[in-house]
Regions:
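Juxtamembrane/disordered regions of integral membrane proteins
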Residues: 2-259
Length: 259
């Protein structure tokens, strides 16, 4: 059998496996976004009010009131976090899924740590004065950093459950998996292009790199593909961690200067 013929035979199977992984990753990330990102963030703000009752009712930078959990605000935050997480968390989940060792809990902790490094500054923002205004910076940072860990644990648990319950990619339902793979990868590629238009080279590397290593790992599984994925995950985590540490130091030192 020629190389071209073998590639034609293997491509549909690879696409089915990629589609199954994309479906699991997106669903797990959406569930984690709803619970950890949406509901969890509202609980975190309530805990800020518990730590410092004097800030209850004050407006945050996002025009939410500390300690108040309105139905409309909670639903809006839950829906937003769910949709955003389907992409942000989903691509990193799939890119790292075959690399993280250990049990479901350990994998969840590692995924949460990676997401904290990569996307931590999207939440723990040094320019957001709320971290200095409410309670204490250490308490606030700890609460919102914990949301990433909770996200990783929920995503890992949901993903593991789906891995057990969904039919394999080689079963009769392989075609829907293939179609799901085409649709999700196409959607993620469009979103990655939109992110690229924003001009942030780090986010470009995160999203486009995740799509690239995930596709390579399924289409051409090999030690080289795993090596690329490991290098990608280590690289974006290291770069993101540097920015996160800088943000935390800036917030804490700014609080010390204002004291």
């Amino acid at each position: 059998m020629t190389v071209a013929a073998r590639a034609r035979r293997e491509s549909p199977a690879a696409l089915r496996h990629l589609g199954r992984s994309a479906l699991i990753g997106s669903t797990a990330a959406m569930a984690a976004g709803l619970l950890a990102g949406g509901i969890g963030s509202r609980i975190a703000m309530s805990l800020v009010a518990v730590a410092d009752p004097s800030v209850t009712g004050l407006l945050t930078a996002n025009d939410n009131r500390v300690g108040e959990m309105s139905l409309g605000g909670t639903l809006f935050l839950a829906v937003t976090a769910t949709l955003v997480s389907a992409f942000h968390g989903g691509v990193v989940y799939i890119a790292s899924g075959r690399l993280l060792p250990g049990s479901t809990v350990v994998r969840g902790l590692l995924l949460g740590a990676a997401l904290l490094c990569v996307f931590g500054t999207e939440i723990i923002d040094a320019t957001n004065r709320d971290f200095v205004r409410f309670a204490s910076p250490a308490w606030d940072i700890g609460l919102f950093a914990g949301l990433f860990v909770a996200f990783g644990l929920v995503a890992s648990g949901v993903g593991a459950a789906m891995e057990r319950r969904l039919p394999s990619a080689d079963a009769e339902l392989g075609l829907p998996f293939a179609l799901a793979g085409v649709g999700l990868i196409a959607l993620w590629s469009v979103i990655a292009v939109l992110v690229s238009a924003d001009g942030d080279p780090y986010l470009i590397a995160v999203f486009e790199g995740a799509i690239g290593v995930s596709t390579l790992a399924h289409v051409r599984p090999s030690h080289l593909a795993s090596g690329f994925a490991c290098a990608y995950l280590a690289g974006i985590s290291a770069v993101g961690a540097i920015g996160l540490v800088r943000a935390v130091v800036d917030i804490v030192t700014r609080d010390a200067r204002l004291s």
